Regions:
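Conserved protein kinase catalytic domain
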Residues: 80-84, 120, 175, 221-224, ...
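ABC transporter nucleotide-binding domains
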Residues: 2-6, 11-210
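ABC transporter nucleotide-binding domain
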Residues: 175-266
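C-terminal coupling/interaction segments
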Residues: 266-307
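Generic beta-strand hydrophobic packing signal
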Residues: 9, 27, 254-256, 288
């Protein structure tokens, strides 16, 4: 059973004196249970609007949205304990400690006090839980927000740009946390992000939006494999001499780093023919390997007309 299922969802915003803005346009989306599912798209592609529709914050104009096979927003009151979310910058009492903020949330949610320590440990804030929130870094506040979202032991955790504004150290901590949460065997993490490297490193599945529609969805490795670059990496004893020969044969060749990293040969239709051509001229390859597309390349290719 899918955790999230969206069929033909549409949302148009209408503002007085301005043209209608179609944020989501016939979106189909399926998120199976388990792991981390990345949700990507350019600014204005409908990611946040989709999340807001799933959480009942805005209503769809058309289509159907389901969580755990229940139609939302109607079923949200019954599902609320199964869903945790961090959609905007979390708000806490700044002069209270991190622990006290969570204790108050636990009381209102009917959660046992012992759960507070559990979620603080999960997000790595147990040793800072007695500090006032006003002294927390942005990354710590984001992690405290995730701790709050985890209080009810949700089966689905929805995160909208959790790494926004974080410094490099904070981003590393957030990636590690998301990876752990997705690996716990109980929680499905639905991660909306514009950070392609983050998604490629932590996600098992990915969906890419453009102009409010899904343009590709699947396992990250399968999505990348489906977009072959046609480029190959070659290693050879005489890289400069080989480069001259390949360029004379009409290939575009770029360096992949230092002399030990090899050369990238672009748009190779027949790698065996490239190998034969070099061998006939006394340049024998120690490596000839296809270069898979990375998520950034796939993303830019699929969304280039939507940016």
């Amino acid at each position: 059973m899918p955790v999230i299922e969206v069929r033909g969802a549409a949302k148009t915003y209408r503002r007085r004196g301005k043209p209608a803005e179609k944020a989501v346009d016939g979106l189909d989306l399926v998120v199976e249970g388990g792991g981390v599912h990345g949700f990507l798209g350019p600014n204005g592609s409908g990611k946040t609007t989709t999340i807001r529709m799933l959480l009942g914050m805005v209503r769809a104009n058309a289509g159907e949205l389901r969580l755990f096979d229940r139609v939302v927003p109607d079923a949200l009151p019954e599902l609320i304990g199964d869903i945790g979310a961090l959609v905007e910058t979390p708000l806490f009492f700044p002069t209270f400690t991190g622990r006290r903020n969570l204790e108050l949330l636990a009381i209102t949610a009917g959660v046992a006090p012992a759960r507070v320590d559990e979620v603080l440990a999960t997000v790595g804030l147990l040793d800072r839980s007695s500090d006032h929130v006003k002294g927390y870094s942005l990354g710590m506040k984001q992690r405290l927000g995730i701790a709050a979202a985890l209080l009810k032991k949700p089966r689905l955790l929805i995160l909208d740009e959790p790494s926004n504004g974080l410094d490099p150290a904070g981003m590393v901590e957030m990636r590690e946390l998301i990876r752990r949460l997705g690996a716990d065997g109980r929680t499905t993490v639905f991660l909306s992000s514009h950070l392609l490297g983050e998604v490629e490193q932590v996600c098992d599945h990915v969906t890419i939006l453009a102009r409010g529609r899904c343009v590709v969805s699947g396992r990250v490795d399968e999505v990348l494999a489906s977009r072959e670059t046609g480029d190959v990496r070659v290693r050879v004893a005489d890289p400069e001499g080989s480069r001259v020969l390949m360029e004379q044969a009409g290939f575009t060749v770029t360096s992949m780093g230092d002399a030990h990293s090899g050369l990238r040969v672009h748009g190779v239709d027949d790698p065996a023919e490239l190998n034969r051509m070099l061998a006939e001229r006394g340049h024998y390859l120690s490596e000839l390997a296809p270069i898979a597309a990375d998520l950034e390349t796939v993303f830019l290719d699929l969304t280039k007309d939507a940016s």
